[in-house]
């Protein structure tokens, strides 16, 4: 077991709790019901995948895409419209997450989508949405991506959007803005968008429907499209960009043609079959629309497959439909496997073992080894060995998913996975950034000055190291280090990074799950696997913080608004408990040696009291950011496998 230099194992003040024996029947019964439900959700091929729901921008954009292309499925459009109307807030706006404040950009897109779908603008829900948008300064105040959509639908002039010429594709690597300097999701979204914006492509919009009523000033006369640019660097870049845009008419046609060819070749190489460009909805739509402008007919393989990749994201119910931003089978299968491994740790169940074997074999088959990948630009000498987040995304293995999957394979204790584990260890260790942490898809993606450019008003252009991803990498690599002797420096650097990232209140920030509870869980499970003593000051501060934020009903909950207001008194707090957050807090506290604490007992009781009749839990609220402050997610599996994991660990701690 790897030992940290700050190990206080000789400290006499710490004593491991002695578990008392109480009636375990309710816990055992809850575990059985939750396990049985999960086993029924497994697909024949061995994987699990649950719905991944975003805010209303994605389904609204699906309707907008249909009208952009003049490929309108009226029945589907009607079902999506039902979904959109059902999510309107009482004040007429639309929020980025359940219970959140209204968001101008989201509300503009939904209003436009519903108008395209045939809703009367004088209907009460449309009037309320319009009045709310106008009260916020109108559609001119929406974000860059919304204004680009409005420009393509000819609702605002092109000067309302940043100057993003396709000639960016020809810039040298040393240039301050280069494609390789931004995150994978930015690359895949931007490259086809360069083509669309440089050529000022407009929507077919067969009914010629507009939304001029959403502007307080005539869009042609509006002079305040970039009020969000406030930093000196941002204003400097905006000035340079506005100046450069005046020369666009004089750019040589051959240069534009060369850049367009390079951009189209770049994204066509990464179309990724029926899983789509980057396997994310915004990139897929941009690619689909760019292929149309480039002249590919509807029957062409690229167009056909690009459309299918988008359609595969739809969730169609009897009375409504929505579009997912992506799908999460590898992530869901990896985490479900870890939960079921905890269930089967000491009490072998043949059905569970068979399900685990099938799941792990499916995961092993999805490992990306010698595939091309953008990550190789920063780490050309590292051996491939990661996993994507989606079914297929060969250019973009996900470090976080890879750590979870590799850890599950390692715990599977099956020699058939030895080579997969070896490759995963080499790849994850090789993807460590210089500061000791890990980003999600790239190493050393820390060009923070780029977040000041006008295009980056979303603040999500980059993929820097984060505590949650780093905690899971530590979890896997520390376990692997029990078999390998070449990971000591990697682990020491990771611990140094995570200690530095701890907040003064004892928590850690959660980039990919909400929020400080998620981040703290991520790090504490890594610390536990790394062999840190339970009396380590960092662990004690984290445990004390988790105890301090427990709700009166025994559970835990955290508001997504902590990404907007991260002040200490808001962290780890919400007006209600959630099974997801309760489970994470319990797993974190047990990793900190608190299995016998009254706080853990109360949390377990909360889970027992709130389990549904089918064996799972039903959280109402979103549980992760796609991009903090901009885009949020609800993983529908989180209230199914995390509570099972927590209950199983509690049972195992008390018996062993």
Describe every region a protein language model picked out.
Residues 1-656:
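Preference for long, amphipathic alpha-helical scaffolds in soluble/luminal domains
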């Amino acid at each position: 077991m790897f030992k940290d230099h700050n190990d206080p194992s000789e400290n006499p003040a710490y004593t491991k709790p002695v578990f008392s024996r109480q009636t375990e029947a309710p816990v055992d019964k809850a575990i059985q019901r939750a396990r049985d439900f999960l086993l029924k959700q497994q697909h024949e091929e061995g994987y699990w995948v649950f719905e991944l729901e975003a805010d209303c921008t994605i389904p609204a954009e699906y309707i907008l895409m249909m009208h952009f292309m003049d490929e309108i499925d009226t029945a589907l459009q009607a079902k999506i419209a039902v979904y959109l109307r059902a999510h309107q807030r009482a004040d007429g706006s639309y929020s980025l997450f359940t219970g959140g404040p209204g968001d101008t950009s989201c509300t503009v897109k939904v209003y436009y989508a519903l108008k395209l779908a045939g809703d009367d603008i004088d209907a009460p829900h449309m009037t309320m949405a319009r009045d709310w948008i106008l009260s916020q300064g109108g559609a001119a105040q929406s974000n860059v991506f919304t204004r680009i959509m409005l420009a393509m639908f000819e609702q605002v002039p092109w000067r309302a959007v940043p100057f993003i010429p396709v000639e960016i594709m020809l810039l040298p690597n040393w240039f301050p803005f280069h494609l390789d300097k931004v995150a994978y999701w930015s690359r895949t979204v931007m490259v086809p968008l360069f083509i669309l914006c440089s050529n000022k492509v407009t929507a077919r919009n067969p009914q010629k429907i507009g939304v001029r009523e959403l502007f307080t000033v005539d869009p042609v006369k509006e002079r305040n499209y970039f009020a969000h640019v406030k930093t000196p660097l941002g204003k400097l870049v905006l000035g340079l960009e506005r100046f450069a845009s005046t020369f666009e008419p004089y750019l040589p046609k051959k240069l534009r043609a060369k850049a367009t060819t390079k951009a189209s070749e770049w994204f066509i190489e990464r179309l990724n079959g029926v899983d789509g460009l980057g396997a994310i909805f915004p990139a897929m739509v941009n690619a689909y629309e760019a292929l149309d402008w480039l002249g590919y007919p509807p029957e062409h393989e690229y167009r056909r497959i690009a459309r299918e990749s988008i359609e595969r994201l739809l969730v169609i119910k009897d009375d409504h439909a929505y579009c997912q931003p992506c799908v999460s089978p590898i992530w869901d299968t990896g985490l479900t496997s870890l939960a079921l491994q905890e269930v089967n740790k000491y009490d072998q169940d043949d059905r569970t073992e068979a399900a685990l074997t099938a799941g792990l074999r499916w995961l092993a088959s999805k490992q990306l080894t010698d595939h091309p990948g953008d990550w190789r630009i920063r780490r050309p000498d590292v051996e491939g060995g990661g996993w994507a987040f989606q079914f297929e995304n060969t250019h973009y293995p996900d470090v976080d998913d890879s750590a979870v999957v590799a850890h599950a394979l390692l715990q599977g204790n099956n020699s058939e996975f030895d080579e997969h584990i070896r490759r995963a260890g080499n790849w994850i260790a090789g993807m460590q950034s210089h500061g000791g942490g890990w980003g999600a898809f790239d190493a050393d993606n820390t060009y923070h000055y780029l977040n000041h450019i006008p295009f980056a008003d979303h603040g999500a252009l980059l993929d820097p190291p984060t505590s949650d991803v780093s905690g899971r990498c530590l979890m896997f690599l520390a376990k692997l280090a029990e078999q390998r002797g070449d990971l000591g420096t990697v682990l020491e650097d990771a611990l140094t990074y995570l200690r530095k990232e701890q907040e003064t209140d004892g928590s850690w920030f959660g980039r990919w799950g909400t929020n400080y509870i998620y981040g703290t869980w991520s790090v504490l499970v890594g610390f536990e696997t790394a062999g840190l003593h339970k009396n380590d000051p960092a662990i004690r501060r984290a445990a004390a913080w988790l105890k301090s934020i427990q709700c009166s009903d025994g559970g835990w909950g955290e508001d997504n608004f902590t990404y907007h207001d991260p002040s200490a008194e808001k962290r780890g707090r919400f007006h209600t408990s959630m099974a997801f957050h309760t489970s994470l807090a319990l797993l974190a506290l047990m990793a900190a040696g608190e299995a016998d604490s009254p706080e853990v007992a109360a949390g377990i009781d909360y889970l027992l009291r709130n389990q549904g009749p089918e064996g799972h839990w039903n959280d109402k609220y979103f549980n992760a950011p796609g991009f903090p402050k901009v885009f949020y997610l609800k993983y529908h599996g989180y209230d199914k496998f995390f509570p099972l994991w927590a209950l199983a660990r509690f049972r195992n701690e008390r018996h062993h």
